[in-house]
Each structure stands twice: as C-alpha cells, then as structure tokens.
Design a protein with these regions (language model features):
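S-adenosylmethionine/decaboxylated-SAM
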Residues: 2-190
Length: 190
C-alpha cells in the first residue's frame, strides 16, 4: 500500500510522530529521496512508553540508533534531506509547529507515538490540521494491545484503536479511508 501512495501523490514534506530507532523515516528517505528533496519532522521523547519500561528497553540506545540510522540514510540520498528532530512530547511539538504556521503544510503524516488513547487522539487532531488537502495520514498500531505481550489486564484507554475510531467518526466528512490493513489505517484528507 505504501508504494501505491508514493506513486499517487508527490511527497516532499513529512511529519512523523513517534520515531523510535528511525526505521520508518529511513524507509521514507530510501524510497522518496531518489525522487526529490525532502523536509522531514520527527517527533519523539525517546523516553519510551510503559511497554518499553516494562521490557527494560534502554531508550538512550534507541535514540542513538535513530541518530545513526537517519544520518546514514541521509548521507546515501540522491537529493537533499532536511531532517528536524523534536525531542519533546508530541502535544508540545505539534502545537509548536502549528504556531509556526505549519497548518495544511505536510503531504504525509505518520502517527506511531504513544499508544495511550488520549495521546493518540491529540496526535491525530493536530497532525490532521497540518496535513495538506489530498495528503495522506497513516496510523500505525491500529489493533495494538499491550495485554498479550506484557501479561497485564486490557485497558481500552491504553490502546490506539479507541482514539483512532473517535477521530475517524468526528472527521469523517473531511477524510476518506483509503485502506485498513490489520495493523495500520490509511486516510486521505479531502
């Protein structure tokens, strides 16, 4: 599905919420960097979510991996890549970008930050405000749940699906659902 999107719309400005080790942004650089210059904004606290803390993940290493991975991808790109890293909560970083005039600015928004429903809803609303008309937004972890991997009781407020569904229902007149593979949901702004 990603390749279909890349052939359907020209992507030059990218917003990623939740960057972790940079796998997605490096993929985007590898796929889109040969076509044109890119302006990329990556937002992450690099503190990890509760699931990372439960697993004992060293988030300093994760952030270092992000820096190394993105620097390598940028150095191998045919075109210019301007990557801006925001080490902040998504609510603060997204609000800052909006206050800097980034409304209707991005061609592509990828939401893969916190899994807590209230955070996901905030990311969706603010990210959508910054998405251009005909731009594409992808929600990762649509059906993610922590209960299986962490062996803790399921709390629907700690998973993305409830927030993504609420966002879709509220904004349905302003978007179209492109596809919904099991783990991701793709929308396009009208």
């Amino acid at each position: 599905m990603w390749d279909e999107i890349f052939s359907a719309i020209k992507i030059e400005r990218i917003l990623e919420v939740g960057s972790f080790e940079g796998a997605t942004v490096c993929y985007l650089i590898d796929k889109l960097g040969p076509k044109n210059n890119l302006e990329i904004y990556c937002i992450d606290t690099w503190e990890g979510g509760f699931e990372h803390k439960e697993q004992g993940k060293n988030m300093s290493t994760v952030e270092s991996n992000f820096d190394e991975n993105t620097n390598f991808a940028i150095s191998n790109s045919k075109h210019s890549i301007a990557l801006k890293k925001y080490k902040k909560t998504s609510a603060v970083a997204l609000s800052t970008l909006l206050s800097e005039g980034k409304e209707n600015y991005f061609d592509f928004v990828y939401i893969d930050g916190s899994h807590v429903a209230s955070d996901v809803l905030c990311d969706a609303i603010l990210g959508f405000k910054m998405l251009k008309h005909n731009g594409v937004m992808i929600f990762d972890d649509y059906l993610w749940t922590h209960s299986i991997e962490l062996n803790i009781p399921l709390n629907p407020l700690d998973i993305p699906k409830i927030a993504i569904d609420a966002f879709i229902n509220i904004y349905i007149r302003e978007l179209r659902i492109m596809t919904a593979p099991l783990y991701q949901l793709f929308i396009q702004k009208k």
